């Protein structure tokens, strides 16, 4: 029997709306909120401690792509997940919705997805600012999918369509729906933004008649290029293998797809990033400017890789405030 993405039951947790984690909260404060979520979740069948207020299944039946992992989804000690066979969206509702929404994708080299360290904190921060956040658990290309690297894009495109299909339900403006990705999640969100006309899968229902183009995109220390000398990342290994031909490297390099239809981009990276060469963000910045795509690029001297929404001890903690100002300049926040 087909499941309508708009018919997923809403899981409401006591205190969650009041417990949105803002960037200014201390570490003990964040921990207390997460513990409170755990206690509330225990009262609700099917709920889990770290997630959102609703869960939306992306696909009405088995996802496209063929194959996939066996066994249950796995979560490691850091809160990153892998062995994903059922991609989902978790919804974080603001107390005072602005009508804007953001799809959030954590990183992990397309080998796992950083939910607890990247995606969930970003989602709570967005919700605290009136933005409905949708955290995407996407399929990982390295987990035996016949469609290989395309499966993550299938989930990214479908996620944006499912969000638009649920716009009325969650009080959203279909013209103010963006994406935010970290590291490999930044690569995914960037590819979805730059290749919105690419059909990653055959339509399965009426939801696929909706647009998969985000209206704005935030890419935080993203993987951009899979070409030498920037081909040392797990993202490259997961997407195109150990010895890919040049055309495969180019096809999955984000900057090669930037064109006039690409939405405005907000770009953040630290100059001391030892995982993703900071030159990658500069390449993307240049590609956007060359294609006359509006781009705002913020370089921080110190921050490394994987700083998420930042900590009070480092200047990278400023980027969420800059992001909000950027959204205001785009009239996303009104």
Outline where the language-model segments fall.
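N-terminal secretory signal peptides
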Residues: 1-28, 39-41
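Mobile cap/lid helix-loop segments that gate and shape the active-site cleft of serine hydrolases
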Residues: 73-78, 206, 222-257, 263
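Short beta-strand element of the alpha/beta-hydrolase
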Residues: 99-107
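Catalytic nucleophile-loop/oxyanion-hole region of alpha/beta-hydrolase
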Residues: 114-122, 136-174, 311-316
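Primarily recognizes the serine-hydrolase "nucleophile elbow" in alpha/beta-hydrolase
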Residues: 158-231, 249
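Acidic catalytic loop of the alpha/beta-hydrolase fold
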Residues: 272-276
